[in-house]
Amino acid sequence: MMAVRPMCQTTTPMAALPFRLIAVSGSSMLPTFAGGDWLLFRTLHLRDASHLQPLLGKVVVIERESYPGVHFIKRLKRIDDGRAWVEGDNVDVSTDSRQWGALQPTEIVGQVLLRYRRGRASE
């Protein structure tokens, strides 16, 4: 399972910020992302599946309704009946829709835009 931690504490509600920076922990997205990588993501406020289509194949940030405050990094693989099917790139160790089932669109809270890895920026 790949979870992330916020870079810093803030008094501004995180949902109000258009971009966030988080640190990666875990190995479920190897080789794309590794523990210690920093990710910049654009926050999303999806209310229904109509906005999922442009995210297909992209890496998204998930906040499960059953795990509030915990974020997961996964790739949006497909849309099933208006729900998001996500998987980690390292399928042998990833906990994802294969265990959770498809997610509500509201559980997709961001799209990863940029990675900072060990001293260099990359996409």
Regions found by a protein language model. Give the residues of each.
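Extended hydrophobic leader/signal-anchor segments used for secretion and membrane insertion
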Residues: 1-123
